[in-house]
């Protein structure tokens, strides 16, 4: 599996701070299984890639449900922004309509 990722979350995964990637559970994500490998490509530098192994998958109907159930400090938030973390943060990536259509997934990963 190959996915694009912006530089900030890519660095958070690389340093081990982010272990759960949040995505729409669309057709592409429905193909992912535990044990699979994902190659992330930096959206600003295609030569910068990162390979991870899928450890677990957490399916939810919405990011609101996901935010209530997963540890947000593992999802890319940190002590500086955890208090303002909101499911609406994900609407800059995925419209509410698409969230309602596909549902969402938290992909727990480990570095390879």
Set out the residue ranges of the language-model regions.
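Short connector loops at helix/strand junctions that flank enzyme active sites
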Residues: 33-35, 47-49, 102-104
């Amino acid at each position: 599996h190959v996915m694009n990722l912006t530089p900030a979350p890519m660095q958070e995964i690389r340093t081990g701070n982010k272990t759960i990637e949040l995505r729409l559970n669309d057709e592409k994500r429905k193909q992912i299984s535990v044990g699979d490998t994902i190659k992330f490509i930096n959206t600003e530098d295609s030569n910068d890639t990162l390979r991870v192994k899928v450890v677990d998958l957490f399916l939810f109907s919405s990011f609101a449900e996901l935010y209530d159930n997963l540890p947000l400090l593992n999802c890319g938030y940190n002590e500086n922004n955890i208090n303002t973390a909101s499911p609406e943060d994900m609407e800059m990536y995925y419209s509410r309509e698409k969230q309602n259509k596909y549902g969402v997934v938290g992909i727990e990963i480990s570095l390879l």
